Amino acid sequence: MLEKIDHIGIAVRNLDEAIARYTSLCGRGPDHLEEVASQKVKIAMFDVGESRVELLMATAPDSPIAKFIAKRSEGMHHICFKVPNLEEALSRLSTAGMEIIPGAGGKGASGSRVAFVHPKSLPGVMVELVEYA
């Protein structure tokens, strides 16, 4: 079961420039900054109502974000849904025939656990599932 849209992830080349632009858009700076070594990204989170906008910058050339930008340029990378139990959600989606990207259950931002559903499974949209501790 999906609890809510947790955030929308946007891939950027330069985090400082993107932060400046989103600060202008939101009228204030980011609510959270973090480097997530396991995902090879630096992130900035802007709270927007009950959801958030996550800016993601690659920290390594083999990062999924670096590969995304090389192939598609900057822009929307994924939509993330909060789930109460990641294993149950993944089991349900696998049973439904959806392709889970390897590395499911890995460490995400703020101590969360995350998994990604391949965009081939959901008409061109990468979906992230997040479970908070």
Summary of predicted features, one role per range:
Residues 49-53, 60-62, 86:
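Short, charged/polar surface micro-motifs in flexible loops or helix N-caps
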Residues 5-13, 44-47, 54, 66-133:
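Vicinal oxygen chelate
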Residues 15-16, 62, 86, 123:
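Alpha-helix N-cap/helix-start and coil->helix boundary motif
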Residues 9-10, 57, 131:
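Hydrophobic side chains within alpha-helical segments
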Residues 4-6, 18, 25-40, 60-77, ...:
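A cross-kingdom feature marking solvent-exposed beta-strand/loop segments within repeated
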Residues 18-21, 89-93:
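Hydrophobic side chains in well-ordered alpha-helices
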